[in-house]
Amino acid sequence: MESFAYVLILTFAIATLFFAIAFRDPPKIGK
């Protein structure tokens, strides 16, 4: 259970950073 919570928080942190960069600069990946 502890490892699952850790992975969930880590994924949320990475997603937050990804969206922050994606919305700050024009998308360079994809279309």
From Swiss-Prot:
Example of a GO cellular component annotation carried by this entry: photosystem II reaction center
Membrane topology: Single-pass membrane protein
Pfam families according to UniProt: PsbT (PF01405)
Keywords assigned: Membrane, Photosynthesis, Photosystem II, Thylakoid, Transmembrane, Transmembrane helix
Superkingdom assignment: Bacteria
Primary location group: membrane
Location of this chain's protein in the cell: Cellular thylakoid membrane
GO biological process: one example: photosynthesis
Transmembrane regions listed in the UniProt entry: 3-23
Biological function: Found at the monomer-monomer interface of the photosystem II (PS II) dimer, plays a role in assembly and dimerization of PSII. PSII is a light-driven water plastoquinone oxidoreductase, using light energy to abstract electrons from H(2)O, generating a proton gradient subsequently used for ATP formation.
Binding partners and assembly: PSII is composed of 1 copy each of membrane proteins PsbA, PsbB, PsbC, PsbD, PsbE, PsbF, PsbH, PsbI, PsbJ, PsbK, PsbL, PsbM, PsbT, PsbX, PsbY, PsbZ, Psb30/Ycf12, peripheral proteins PsbO, CyanoQ (PsbQ), PsbU, PsbV and a large number of cofactors. It forms dimeric complexes.
Family: Belongs to the PsbT family.
The name this protein goes by in its record: Photosystem II reaction center protein T
Upper taxonomic lineage: Bacteria, Bacillati, Cyanobacteriota, Cyanophyceae, Synechococcales
Gene from which the chain derives: psbT
